[in-house]
Amino acid sequence: VDWTIRRWPENLGRRCKLELGVVGEVRATLEALLPKLTEKRNSAFLQASLAHYREARQGLDDLARGTPGRKPIHPQYLAKVVSDLAAPDAIFTADVGTPTVWAARYLKMNGRRRLLGSFVHGSMANAMAHALGAQAANRARQVISLSGDGGFTMLMGDLITLTQENLPVKVVIFNNGVLGFVALEMKAAGFVDFGVDLNNPDFAAMARAMGVHSRRVEDPGELAGALEEILAHPGPAVLDVVTASQELSLPPNITAEQIKEFSLFVLRAIMSGRGDSVVDLVKTNLLPR
């Protein structure tokens, strides 16, 4: 039986399939449960879990691909390339929203790397602020901010702080032109997304105007080279990556209600003249990468 321990009962089963829910503090609950458990050497559950992980991992890795010339860049591929090229002891910070999803799924942690985020409070624009603090406290370590374009534009004045304090933070921007997680929540609730599109400037050009080394990438074939250049730069640097705006970050389990509401979104989008966005969504998520 899969046990799920949550401090707040309303969170039980919110994101994962629930078999047995327990309400309480994790430490106190485990301390109460452990004396009542007997050791088992049957590894059937472990092997089943490992098999499930390998299958899920393969599915995620299949999405993290980029073909030169095939635009736009998929955010999964960007996160994977960042993980592959980052230092073994890098400190990552992730904005609330889809950057947190891509960081959780594609950054390979090894016991030396750290991942910081606003995982409980859920405040936007946290990535650069966290990166500033992490770099100030660890000037010898590589610090990479995984910023969404929405979060970045909220506090992009922090770029001036990077230059003023000479903090060599590397800012990687997932520039998809939309508040992606909010748009996805609207679609999952059956609504045609509105008020979420962003008319972004060229962030790389803007960073250069502030005296920050920068690159802008739109082609998957140029991504690795550009990121290597950014990471090798001795000072602060910005990598503005144009990513797919219609990428779906699906939860581990999808309910029948979610399928119904998403189908309702598709119908409403077509009837309201937004059929082109539905076509783009299908192409982004179903065509070869």
Feature locations, PLM:
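Short hydrophobic segments within beta-strands
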Residues: 1, 93-95, 146, 172
